């Protein structure tokens, strides 16, 4: 299997229990959508699968490795095989799109090669090809601050496609896109995963998009998995229980501006 969680709990420092006894197995090449109301723990679950955060208790296995039993160096090598798409990609405003996309390989390059790439992009054709898949080839040398929220999200996706990971995790990857573009972008991700046998796991707030594009659906509420089944078996009653006291999201949420985060050195 590619991903496995066994009785995983996550307690934040403020006392909030984000995940409660999660058991989850995902095989190589599977495509899975995680749905649930705001605050259900979807982002926490994805970050745990990405080994970005350590479970408070329980066990996690990623690509055959017990991630938190590895040395820091070994875990860093493991992370280079995992791609994570952020809802708001942390792209410096003045960074050129070509540099942002090529950053997908930083975990696989030496320090010297990475520094050279900051001054002189080393694989312009590769970056252009990744952007072309998302209809953004014309933005290759634009600054990130010149792009819309939806375009920034697509740059983040292009960066992960260029990285070519074995596991692709996407946290609300189309939240700033209109319904048509959101569906088109998810189709691109799904096709890429299928053609390259990549394991794809995405959290989505838009239930209809999840049901339309993913064969397996995991319903998460208050840090617990309420159901895990083929999309064709997801019923209205199951969704009503999952989203009790919540309003189901339409095919894609209203476009909201993204805050571009500048990573600190």
From Swiss-Prot:
Q: Name one Pfam family in it.
A: ABC_tran
Q: Which InterPro entries match?
A: AAA+_ATPase (IPR003593), ABC_transporter-like_ATP-bd (IPR003439), ABC_transporter-like_CS (IPR017871), MetN_ABC_transporter-like (IPR050086), P-loop_NTPase (IPR027417)
The catalysed reaction is:
phosphonate(out) + ATP + H2O = phosphonate(in) + ADP + phosphate + H(+)
Task: Please state what class of enzyme this protein is.
Answer: translocase
Query: What kind of membrane protein is this, topologically?
Result: Peripheral membrane protein
Q: Which domain of life is it from?
A: Bacteria
Quick one: where is this thing mainly located? membrane
Cellular compartments annotated: Cell inner membrane
Any one GO CC term of the record: plasma membrane
Question: What is the E.C. number?
Answer: 7.3.2.2
| MF terms (GO), sorted A to Z | ABC-type phosphonate transporter activity; ATP binding; ATP hydrolysis activity
**What range(s) does the ABC transporter domain occupy?**
3-247
> Which keywords, in A-to-Z order, does the entry hold?
ATP-binding, Cell inner membrane, Cell membrane, Membrane, Nucleotide-binding, Phosphonate transport, Translocase, Transport
Stored PROSITE patterns: ABC_TRANSPORTER_1, ABC_TRANSPORTER_2, PHNC
Description of how the protein assembles with itself and partners: The complex is composed of two ATP-binding proteins (PhnC), two transmembrane proteins (PhnE) and a solute-binding protein (PhnD).
Family of the protein in this entry: Belongs to the ABC transporter superfamily. Phosphonates importer (TC 3.A.1.9.1) family.
Report what the protein is called.
Phosphonates import ATP-binding protein PhnC
